[in-house]
From Swiss-Prot:
This is Decreased expression in renal and prostate cancer protein. Residues 1-12 have a biased composition (Basic and acidic residues). The modification Omega-N-methylarginine is found at R396. GO terms for cellular component: nucleoplasm. It is found in: Nucleus.
Length: 533
């Protein structure tokens, strides 16, 4: 007799009799493996039935940690077999908390996929748990026979054999195409090294957890070693992309985005199929990321910045090489060298001079953040604009400029040639020598780093002793062709605190108001605010 429908929803797959998840467990909740063809509920955990064909992978009951999306994603209802749906992604039912079972092996839906890989726990595949010729065809048949049955079951954590990784610990030889269809089954074995630490392929299932072979379990303890543990809402995921649902960095480092990313370096963004982002937190922008070769921690929304080295380069940038963690939203000072330059920059290398404005390329090593650009603490983010690239390579030493002797070409144009000292020419000048010592005038040789402080057009340079204001100030954009940012002259060895006078845009020379004229030795400043030669 027909069992009453728990949900109004259609069964995930007509051919499976797996019961829908209990009402409370909207998404991926563990359900008893009721007569599921997979039958073997190898894991003590209930298995969520679903298109996975009875996700054998035992999931812990607490599905809660993950968002339980409803809809097709919910409870893995998608018909596509796990393999198909997100090949190699041991997908937890969407809501499922992967953590429950560290090695959760989701049997790839059998039937379609073909013989379940291993007699082993949770044959990934089909009904017959017996070792199928195809070991765990993640891809659903497509992938050639994975040498390893690699049923991913394994207890919670343990070294869940996750045979997928071949033997409990041994990396599976099989293609283990975790990487979705894109990643052809043939791809590198991409053994899912169990505890082995990152496997050859980026897509180590084993997150930091180490042993957790396919520590897909988001919450499992231990930062996921994997390049991409996805941490859902938890603070910064340790792993580059901890996929931890709510639980803290999930070891999963799979990017799991099949195809979209391309192979995604083997990171399977879990994006494949309707499943879409398996864990909401992962915004795998398929395609957009291009191949995100670097493991990037995907900080999604709540994630805040995921400090780990996720280089998420949006759009054209292509793989952001710099390993800087780019959290969504303003990460605040982005310590990483990575310049956060969006746009066609191409690979965003850590120090990229942003050639903007007449200055020409900014030779300066410090990356200019775009816009006021959460200032890279080290680098002053240079707003783009004419001034955008501060040619000077001058390193901004926080504190005394120290011996940055290079004269910093400072003036060009209306300012009049600030005598020899820093001929700062815009345009052609190209990178001006680094530090410009403020040697002239009362200041004496003290070369102070001028933090660029910008507010408003000129930015009001902070008056009064700035002291050493190493903090990078975003350089205002605008007409200030020259280095408009005011350099606060710090007191310090200089002794005289020049109140920083911003370079005025337009005629820097004549912007009298722009520079507060300090009295005392500073009084000698030229009208244009420049120090005397």
């Amino acid at each position: 007799m027909k069992e009453p429908r728990i949900f109004p929803r259609e069964r995930p797959t007509p051919w499976t009799r797996a019961p829908l998840p209990p009402r409370g467990r909207l998404d991926g909740g563990p359900v008893m493996n009721a007569g599921h063809p997979m039958g073997v509920n190898s894991d003590p955990f209930l298995m969520a039935a679903g298109s996975l064909g009875g996700n054998l992978a035992p999931f812990p009951r607490n599905a809660a940690p993950f968002q339980n999306p409803s809809g097709s994603l919910a409870s893995n209802p998608a018909h596509f077999a796990a393999g198909a749906r997100d090949p190699g992604m041991t997908s937890f039912p969407r809501g499922m908390n992967p953590t429950g079972t560290g090695a959760v092996s989701f049997p790839r839906p059998g039937g379609l996929l073909g013989p379940g890989p291993g007699p082993g726990l949770n044959p990934r595949t089909g009904a017959l748990p017996g070792p199928g010729p195809m070991s765990n065809p993640r891809l659903g048949g497509l992938p050639g026979p994975g040498p390893m049955a690699n049923p991913r079951a394994g207890g919670l954590l343990g070294a869940s054999p996750d045979p997928r990784s071949g033997g409990p610990m041994v990396p599976g030889c099989g293609p283990n195409m975790r990487a979705g269809v894109l990643s052809s089954g043939t791809g590198p074995p991409n053994p899912r090294p169990v505890g082995l630490g990152p496997g050859p392929s980026p897509n180590l299932r084993s997150s930091f957890l180490g042993t957790n072979p396919a520590p897909r379990s988001g919450m499992f303890p231990g930062p996921g070693l994997g390049p991409n543990p996805r941490a859902c809402g938890l603070g910064p995921g340790l792993g580059p992309n901890p996929r931890a649902g709510g639980l803290g960095p999930g070891p999963n480092l799979d990017n799991r985005a099949g195809g979209l990313l391309g192979t995604g370096s083997g990171l399977n963004l879990r994006m494949a199929g309707p499943q879409g982002l398996d864990l909401a937190p992962i915004l795998r922008a398929a395609g957009l990321l291009g191949t995100n070769s670097v493991s990037f921690s995907q900080a999604s929304g709540n994630m805040g910045t995921n400090p780990p080295t996720m280089t998420r380069v949006p759009g054209p940038i292509g793989p952001n090489t710099g390993p800087s963690s780019r959290g969504l939203g303003l990460p605040g000072p982005n310590p990483s060298p990575m310049s956060r330059a969006p746009g066609p920059m191409g690979p965003n290398s850590a120090h990229f001079s942003r050639p903007g404005g007449p200055m020409g390329v900014n030779a300066g090593v410090f990356p200019r953040g775009t816009g006021s650009g959460g200032l890279n603490p080290n680098a002053f983010s240079q707003s783009s604009g004419t001034l955008a690239s501060n040619p000077g390579t001058f390193q901004r030493s926080a504190g005394l400029q120290g011996s940055n002797q290079a004269v910093f070409p400072r003036a060009s144009g209306p300012l009049g040639p600030n005598p020899a000292n820093f001929p700062r020419a815009t345009g052609l000048q190209g990178p001006s020598p680094a530090a410009f010592p403020r040697s002239a005038g009362p200041l004496g040789p003290g070369q102070v780093a001028f933090p660029r402080s910008a507010a408003g057009h000129l930015g009001s340079s902070p008056a009064g002793p700035v002291g050493i204001n190493p903090a990078p100030f975003a350089r205002p954009t605008g007409t200030l062709g020259l280095n408009p940012a005011s350099f606060p002259r710090m007191n310090g060895p200089v002794g005289k605190t020049l109140v920083p006078f911003p370079r005025v845009g337009s005629l820097p020379g004549s912007n009298p108001a722009a520079f507060p004229r300090p009295g005392g030795p500073m009084a000698a400043m030229y009208p244009n605010g420049m120090l005397p030669p």
